[in-house]
Amino acid sequence: MVDEQLRPRGVEAQAVLAAMAKVPRHRFVPPPYTRLAYEDRPLPIGHSQTISQPFIVAYMSEAARITPGAKVLEIGTGSGYQAAVLAEMGAEVYTVEIVPELAKRAERTLEELGYRSVRVRSGDGYQGWPQHAPFDAIVVTAAPERIPQPLIDQLAVNGRLIVPVGTQTEDQRMTVLTRTPGGIVEQKTFPVRFVPLTREKPQEH
């Protein structure tokens, strides 16, 4: 996967390549799809969610510029694979998943594989995880129509927020926000297609 899919597409960070060579992606894929686990394609994981294709995971991990000991927030745990890659790179990972069943499954898989530096919580990712802010990097694995302000607020100085932005009917763009000492710098990159970032429904009274 690393030599055939990632290096040829420009992924160069050795920490990313080493992490993705080590994390067993097939453990994060439902049984009907395990034979496809190492192909460069997204795969369904249930509840209308997917595990991102390896290149996207590699790109987001590289763009986040993770260093050992970095505190990283992930929005959209999904299968737990992205969190495992970040943990393998030495990050302390806080990950939020809105679907309780996926959060439990991911937490179980991560525990079985020994990733003790990952904390999983079920909840609304739009709000981030303010109790543990600020974060050196924030990785969002589903697409909001606009970047949630709470996530920007929880980014440390010199931190980077990696997020696909756009609607399901119009273009989505992978976007990198950097909080510099002078303010926020935004860079839009290539077009992508992600599932929407969903929110908790308001309580009816």
Curated annotation (Swiss-Prot):
Protein name: Protein-L-isoaspartate O-methyltransferase
Subcellular location: Cytoplasm
Keywords: Cytoplasm, Methyltransferase, S-adenosyl-L-methionine, Transferase
Active site as annotated: S52
Enzyme class per UniProt: transferase
Entries under InterPro entries matching the protein: PCMT (IPR000682), SAM-dependent_MTases_sf (IPR029063)
Similarity comment: Belongs to the methyltransferase superfamily. L-isoaspartyl/D-aspartyl protein methyltransferase family.
Catalytically driven reaction(s): [protein]-L-isoaspartate + S-adenosyl-L-methionine = [protein]-L-isoaspartate alpha-methyl ester + S-adenosyl-L-homocysteine
Any one Gene Ontology molecular-function term assigned to this protein's record: protein-L-isoaspartate (D-aspartate) O-methyltransferase activity
Entry EC number(s): 2.1.1.77
BP GO annotations: methylation; protein modification process; protein repair
UniProt key word Iron: no
Function: Catalyzes the methyl esterification of L-isoaspartyl residues in peptides and proteins that result from spontaneous decomposition of normal L-aspartyl and L-asparaginyl residues. It plays a role in the repair and/or degradation of damaged proteins.
Cellular component per GO, a single term: cytoplasm
Main localization category: cytoplasm
UniProt keyword Secreted, yes or no: no
